């Protein structure tokens, strides 16, 4: 009995365990239907256009990512290698290579133009000497801080692109006008002309060295001085003596140099001349033979005459633009003051007019002493005969007489000049002065 009961009890336990296993089993799930042979249903509704498709990673995308990372590593290694090589390379070699690259971009030859207007950081409008204007590019290696309207720039000869800036935009012709070395002539080399020397000292030299004298007197120093008189009376010589005596910058120009070929170059040179004078103040501007550009104005159909008149108008403008106490003085010289325009020599522009007449007996004696001081003269030489003569000899004629007498003595292998040499030299000088050069010189 006990065995049977125990047997029945064992079966009951097995049945309970089976029921637990059935309860633990998962529910039946239907298999995913196959899409093969079935059309994809089109998504309907407004939200379908904004939904992104589901993207699942693939092995091919992973390979592309690994390849891109490897390429990036190689590029970083190459960049590091180049940086190391640049660091090891001497600085001078790097600079030479950079200059060579810039020169290659610039090209040769380079044209010079004027910057008219800056459009933006990369474009500008430039003009050339011919007068045409161009809309051009500005190269990246050009210093943008130095660019300003009106400055001189370097242009490529093909596309006129701006490839550089001229730091010193001074006209080369104006730079040549500036005397780097003072002339050797002094006031002692000027025979006579004591009154003229005193007047030019008061008008030019003293305002530059002692301007306080004029302030105490309550007057304004003259702006400009004009020297006029017959040829050979010492106008240019006195201007050289002024340049030697003062420590001011001396700018010398001949009036014919202001007449240029292209339209507008003459007035531009006048502006450059006075701009350089103001930058190097105190300075003296000496314009010799001013009658080349300062003649009286009249109606003319010639383009050259109109350009000369424009140059003179720019000169008048520059004379009016000076400060009354400025450290720039204007010195002019001419042989024909009657042909000058009245607007040029009126008070306010040219305040003092100094006349240089033909030398008198006292001045002739002084000039002869200056030019014969180093010559060996014979005992029979009497210079008073030439001094008291009524011949209209200028200072340049007397100098030519002394030089010609010395040449005649050298022709005869003599180191002493005789009275006969002076007489022959006087005849030659007077003949060339009155009759001109002999025709035999041109045969």
From Swiss-Prot:
Q: Which regions are flagged for Basic and acidic residues bias?
A: 12-29
User: Cellular location of this protein?
Assistant: Cytoplasm; Nucleus
InterPro entries the record matches: 26S_Proteasome_ATPase (IPR050221), AAA+_ATPase (IPR003593), AAA_lid_3 (IPR041569), ATPase_AAA_core (IPR003959), ATPase_AAA_CS (IPR003960), NA-bd_OB-fold (IPR012340), P-loop_NTPase (IPR027417), Prot_ATP_ID_OB_2nd (IPR032501)
- Sequence segments annotated as region (Disordered): 1-53
User: How does a null allele present?
Assistant: RNAi-mediated knockdown at the L1 larval stage, causes 20 percent increase in mei-1 protein levels.
User: Major location, coarse class?
Assistant: cytoplasm
Asked if the record carries the keyword Nucleotidyltransferase, the reply is no
User: Which Pfam families does its entry note?
Assistant: AAA, AAA_lid_3, Prot_ATP_ID_OB_C
- Function of the protein: The 26S proteasome is involved in the ATP-dependent degradation of ubiquitinated proteins. The regulatory (or ATPase) complex confers ATP dependency and substrate specificity to the 26S complex. May play a role in the degradation of microtubule severing protein mei-1.
The protein, known as:
Probable 26S proteasome regulatory subunit 4
**Which gene name belongs to this protein?**
rpt-2
């Amino acid at each position: 009995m006990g065995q049977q009961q125990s047997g029945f009890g064992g079966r009951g336990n097995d049945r309970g365990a089976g029921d637990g296993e059935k309860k633990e089993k998962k529910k039946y799930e239907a298999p995913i239907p196959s899409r093969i042979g079935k059309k994809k249903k089109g998504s309907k509704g407004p939200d379908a256009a904004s939904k992104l498709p589901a993207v699942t990673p693939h092995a091919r995308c992973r390979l592309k990512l690994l390849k891109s990372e490897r390429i990036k590593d190689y590029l970083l290694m190459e960049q590091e290698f180049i940086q190391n090589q640049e660091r090891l390379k001497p600085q001078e070699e790097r600079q030479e290579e950079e200059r060579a690259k810039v020169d290659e971009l610039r090209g040769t030859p380079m044209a010079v133009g004027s910057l008219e207007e800056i459009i933006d950081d990369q474009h500008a409008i430039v003009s050339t000497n011919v007068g045409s204007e161009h809309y051009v590019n500005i190269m990246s290696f050009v210093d943008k801080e130095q660019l300003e309207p009106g400055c001189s720039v370097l242009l490529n000869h093909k596309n006129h692109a701006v490839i550089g800036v001229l730091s010193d935009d001074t006209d080369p012709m104006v730079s040549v006008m500036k005397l780097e070395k003072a002339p050797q002539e002094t006031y002692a080399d000027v025979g006579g002309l004591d009154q003229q020397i005193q007047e030019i000292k008061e008008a030019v030299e003293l305002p530059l060295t002692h301007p306080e004298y004029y302030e105490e007197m309550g007057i304004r120093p003259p702006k400009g001085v004009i020297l006029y008189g017959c040829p050979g009376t010492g106008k240019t010589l006195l201007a050289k003596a002024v340049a030697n005596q003062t420590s001011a910058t001396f700018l010398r120009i001949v009036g014919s140099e202001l007449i240029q070929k292209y339209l507008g170059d003459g007035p531009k040179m006048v502006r450059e001349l006075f701009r350089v004078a103001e930058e190097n103040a105190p300075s003296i501007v000496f314009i010799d033979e001013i009658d080349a550009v300062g003649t009286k104005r009249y109606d003319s159909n010639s383009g050259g005459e109109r350009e000369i008149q424009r140059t003179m108008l720019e000169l008048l403008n520059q004379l009016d633009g000076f400060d009354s106490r400025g450290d720039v003085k204007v010195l002019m010289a001419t042989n024909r003051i009657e042909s000058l325009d009245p607007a040029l020599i009126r008070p306010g522009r040219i305040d003092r007019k100094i006349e240089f007449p033909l030398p008198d007996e006292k001045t002739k004696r002084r000039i002869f002493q200056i030019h014969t001081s180093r010559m060996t003269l014979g005992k029979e030489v009497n210079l008073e005969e030439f001094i008291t003569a009524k011949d209209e000899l200028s200072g340049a004629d007397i100098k030519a007489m002394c030089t010609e007498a010395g040449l005649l003595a050298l022709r005869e292998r003599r180191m002493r000049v005789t009275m006969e040499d002076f007489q022959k030299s006087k005849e030659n000088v007077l003949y060339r002065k009155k009759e001109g050069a002999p025709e035999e010189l041109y045969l």
